[in-house]
Amino acid sequence: MNYLIERRQEEKERRRVEILDAAEATAREVGIGAMTMDQVARKARLSRALLYVYFQDKDDLLFGLCNRALDILEQRFIEAVGRHKLGIDQVEACGRAYIAFAQEFPVYAESLAAFEAHSVEQLATEGNVGACVIAGDRVHAVLIAAITRGMADGSVRPDAGPPPLVSFTLWGFLHGVLQLATNKAAILAHGGTTTQQLLEQALLQGTRSIATRR
C-alpha cells in the first residue's frame, strides 16, 4: 500500500513539474501577461480540468514559477556571498547576482514582479503562495546575514539600520531599478543613459548608502 501511495505521489510531482515547464515555455513565447491557462494546458498536453487539479488559477501557476525562481536566486546569492570575505562586498555581490539572474531568466524575473505586486493581505501561508513566502524568506536570510557580517567586520555602518529592514530596502530599491531597466529602456536611451549604466549606478548608490568606506 505504501508503495502505491509513493508511486502516486511521484507521478503527481512529475506532472506538476511538467506543467511548470509548460508554463515557463509558454511565458517565453507570449509573455506572462498574455499567457493563459488554455495555452499552458495545450503545451503540457493536458486537459484544462486536469490542469486545474494542480493549479487553481493563473495566479497560483505564477506562484509555482515564482517558487522555482526563488530557489535559483537563493543558490545564486549563496554562491555570490561565498566568493567574498567582507560583508559589504557580499551585499554588492548579491546585488550583482540579482541583476544577472533577472537578465538570464526574464520569465522568472517577471514571475517575481507579479509576486511582489500582491499585497500582504493576499499572501497565504499554505500552497504555492506560502511556498513563495518561505522561499523569499530564505533569499532575504542570505542578504541579512551579509549585512550582519558587514556590521560585525566594520564594512557596513552600524547605524545603517536593522539588517532585516536594510535587506528589504535594498531589495525594493534594486527591484524597482530593474523594472525601469526592463520596461523603460527607450526612455533611458532618450536621456542618454543605457540600462547597464543605470544598474551600475544603482549598485554603487545602494552599497555606498550602507558602507563605512567606498
Predicted regions and their residues:
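Alpha-helical DNA-contacting segments of helix-turn-helix folds
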Residues: 62-69, 112
